[in-house]
């Protein structure tokens, strides 16, 4: 029997390659979409769940029968941030269903104790905190929720996302961003690889091309 994973944000920039990558690795997928026609995926291994990520019944339906959760939920920088609200609901539902593995993404500008960022990356993080203070505060709250959750979580910090670039070598670092951009394909590949990789459980690695 195939392991089944739930995907939130699977039609966005970072997530649109996730479902196909997961199927190639032998997983079955349950993917949340607001509008099913937005997804052009046509695969018997992919089940589309229509709904809103803020709705508890939708999240319960999405996660039922799953072994792990991948969250790439995204929204415009100027929108009222919902990251922590949705992550809190996902965590609660995962606990109810006894799902342990969670893999998510956040911005590389999120500072964490122990970071050893270059001067340029430090300046970039400061600029983001000034320009998008509400969003960055919500992303920090999201991290704190995961840290307190007792789940096997990994929160991957990303640079600028390039949608149409080909797959390249993925650079990884625990303490600083190793590049300025990454392709959507490589984000998907790295996230799928983490489902059974314990190396980054409870950690916030940086990745880039």
Residue ranges and their predicted role:
Residues 5-25:
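N-terminal Rossmann NAD(P)H-binding glycine-rich loop of SDR-like oxidoreductase domains
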Residues 32-37, 52-53:
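N-terminal Rossmann-fold cofactor-binding loop
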Residues 76-104, 141:
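NAD(P)-cofactor binding segment of oxidoreductase domains
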Residues 82, 156, 180-192, 203:
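Substrate-positioning beta->alpha
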Residues 143-164:
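Conserved beta-loop-beta element that borders a ligand/cofactor-binding pocket
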Residues 149, 165-170, 194-203:
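Glycine/proline-rich active-site loop of Rossmann-fold NAD(P)-dependent oxidoreductases
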